[in-house]
């Protein structure tokens, strides 16, 4: 059997790293500088898979753009947002590829992606995956921007829901609210993930308790954790949950919508979850790199009990259609 056909590409253990640090907000070039440094730092820490949070390049739109927004501030911010989006491929994305190759690591990073086809300048919320050889393995555009996100990003076409063979095994992923799109998760699970990457902009405050009346100030009841733990159990895979971090010091003093920012939930909270759905590391808060050692034996033991694509599946009763392949 080739390494490509083995769990975690035949490795007994993979160290993953979540880079939980603020980008240089709405500054693509300097954020790429920082990303390259952090990739090297994580690799020096023994990581083979390095993950950054949702739209880490070069910042999630944490500000409010209601109808009462100042039009001049809105135009200024939108120009910054547009001008600091990433083209794929480009000289900027090539720098990330070179950093991955130089450190010999697989990199997954969230970005604001600019679609620069002639006459098309839509932005997308994109997950970019780069192999340890510096090759772009794949990119996935978020299928459906959530709530007010629709004002910033277009809908992904959906033709990129694939799990990729990498040096650390089969890597798939989804972005934030896609984890409540049950069929999207089923699509990833059906392809056999070793690692599932889950990107979020922050650990949202929710209310807990039997009557949802207890405030959750530290985000420990963040609904993303429930989705990620369920996915780990169902997929028999490690889930790397990368949660965004930013603070007031990271926002430029001249940012026009500084007063309308909602960044209280962008405090980190990244975690790595074992195949049985139990947290392996985290949640961890603050500016740091979160490391976790992931042994292949955990996947093997999980699948010995529940193998969703094997003995625990009933394709004769239930099946999933992926429409882009129907149209191919």
Regions found by a protein language model. Name each.
Residues 109-111, 125-129, 162, 270-272, ...:
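Short beta-strand scaffold segments in enzyme catalytic cores
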Residues 28, 37-132, 202-230, 234-237:
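Cys-nucleophile CN-hydrolase/nitrilase-fold catalytic domain and related Cys-dependent amidase chemistry
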Residues 126, 139, 282-283, 291:
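Residue-level detector of high-confidence beta-strand sites
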Residues 86-108, 170, 176-290:
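CN hydrolase (nitrilase-like) catalytic-core segments centered on the catalytic cysteine
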Residues 13-25, 126, 139, 169-178, ...:
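Active-site-proximal beta-strand elements of phosphoester/diester hydrolases
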Residues 142-156, 287-305:
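A short, polar/charged loop-to-alpha-helix boundary motif
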Residues 1-49:
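N-terminal active-site segment of His-dependent metallophosphoesterases
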Residues 162-194, 198-200, 299-328:
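Cysteine/selenocysteine-centered motifs that mediate thiol-based redox chemistry or coordinate metal-sulfur cofactors
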């Amino acid at each position: 059997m080739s390494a490509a056909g083995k769990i975690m590409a035949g490795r007994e253990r993979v160290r993953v790293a979540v880079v939980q640090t603020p980008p240089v907000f709405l500054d693509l070039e300097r954020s790429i500088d920082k990303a390259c440094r952090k990739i090297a730092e994580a690799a020096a820490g023994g990581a083979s898979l390095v993950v950054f949070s949702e739209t880490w390049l070069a910042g999630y739109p944490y500000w409010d753009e209601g109808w009462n927004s100042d039009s001049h501030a809105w135009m200024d911010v939108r120009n910054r947002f547009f001008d600091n989006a990433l083209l794929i491929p480009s000289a900027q994305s090539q720098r990330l590829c070179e950093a991955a190759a130089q450190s010999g690591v697989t990199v997954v990073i969230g970005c604001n992606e600019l679609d620069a086809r002639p006459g098309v300048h839509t932005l997308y919320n994109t997950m970019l995956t780069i192999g340890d050889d510096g090759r772009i393995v794949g990119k996935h555009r978020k299928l459906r921007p959530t709530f007010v996100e629709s004002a910033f990003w277009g809908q992904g076409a959906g033709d990129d829901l694939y799990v990729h063979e990498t040096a650390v095994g089969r890597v798939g992923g989804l972005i934030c609210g896609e984890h409540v799109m049950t069929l999207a998760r089923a699509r990833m699970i059906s392809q056999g993930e070793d690692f599932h990457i889950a990107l979020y902009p922050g650990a949202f405050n929710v209310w807990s308790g039997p009557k949802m009346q207890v405030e959750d100030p530290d985000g420990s009841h963040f609904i993303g954790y429930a989705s990620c733990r369920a996915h780990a159990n169902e997929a028999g895979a490690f889930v790397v949950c990368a949660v965004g971090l930013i603070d007031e010091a990271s926002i430029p003093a001249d940012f026009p919508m500084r007063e309308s920012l909602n960044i209280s939930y962008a405090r980190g909270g990244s975690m790595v979850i074992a195949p049985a759905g139990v947290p392996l590391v985290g949640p961890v808060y603050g500016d740091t790199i979160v490391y976790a050692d992931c042994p292949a034996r955990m996947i093997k033991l999980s699948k010995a009990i529940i193998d969703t694509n094997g003995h625990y599946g009933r394709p004769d009763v239930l099946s999933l259609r992926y429409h882009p392949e129907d149209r191919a």
